[in-house]
Amino acid sequence: MKNKTRNIFFLVGLVFVVLMILTFKVSFRELWQQICHAGYWLVAIIGMWVPLYIMNTFTWRTILLGSGECNIPFWKLLKVTISGFALNYATPVGLMGGEPYKIMEIKPYVGVQRASSSTVLFAMMHIFSHFWYWITALVLYLIFMPVNMLMGILLSIVALFCIAGIYFFVKGYKNGMVVKLIRFVSRIPGCRKWGKKFSEKYADDLKKIDGQIADLHKQNKKYFFISFFLEYIGRILQSFEIFFMLMLFADQEPGVMLFVQSLIILAFTSLFANLLFFIPLQLGGREGGFAMVVSNLGMTIQVSMSISIISRVREIFWTSLGLLLMKVGNKNVEVPQHEEYTDS
């Protein structure tokens, strides 16, 4: 990727991070009190994302191996993964920031088609695992928590949403979804001319990318299930972030029930926040989700405020680090001649 292009991504991400910090409606005094209260637990909460990002990187590498050799150094893939998530967190419309950046960064190593298909597949797998994570939380809620009529209706809506999402992604894995996505964009007012021109110009490339997406599910099921397992387990392990915070702020003893509550809180908060994907850093959505879910579990509003503040501190840390990583370790890579992958 040219430094000029990389700098554009960096500046866009930086603008939204600064905007988020300036609109963070917490006084410095309260913020400092929460950080001091968290103490060494804050280090654990921030540090636990190292193995989570490593698992994300292994997922992406597994997907790349499903379509041929992967000659990208692991540290490079890890760096791009962290920076890609940072851009997704920082920019509006989520995936519109990180995914183009990731494609451009690994294109010199694997070619534009494999870079595009693997990045799309990684994004699909990341979202697909979320649907199963939300289903898991829903089942645990039904088993361990009291359910009244209103909550029953809400859980039914969530279940239908998740089932529809899983069905949509399974269809996408079988047949590819890039061509259909471009067609959908072409019907949006203001994007019709661009969508039509783009689909006509890159028709063959888009079909090949869809073919590579379908191949992972049809012909390389081992890589498909390994990548799904890594992402799903990553979502489960992420629940420990809330687990640590509940031990700290709610003064609860560690145990299975506390972990179940942590998983439910994170699942429904992430569902609520992802529905507001168009907001940079999901401003307000995540905090509202914490308040709604935590209060429904019988905890105080102060607990939800403390959790949301520390979560926001962690997000600012990793988003800032991801943006800084965009500026280091960027050596020019000689673009090789890439052969199209065919399964023999």
Predicted regions located by residue number:
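Transmembrane helix-loop-helix hairpins in multi-pass inner-membrane proteins
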Residues: 1-33, 87-193, 283-344
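Membrane-interface helix starts
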Residues: 5, 37-45, 214-229, 317
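A short amphipathic helical element positioned immediately N-terminal to and/or at the very start
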Residues: 29-35, 205-218
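Alpha-helical segments in transporter systems
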Residues: 45-53, 122, 222-234
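Short helix-coil transition sites and intra-membrane helix breaks within transmembrane domains
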Residues: 51-58, 62-65, 89-100, 275-288
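Membrane-embedded helical hairpins/re-entrant loop segments and their flanking transmembrane helices
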Residues: 57-82, 246-265
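Transmembrane helical segments that form the transport core of multi-pass membrane transport proteins
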Residues: 214-269
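Membrane-interfacial helix-loop connectors
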Residues: 246-309
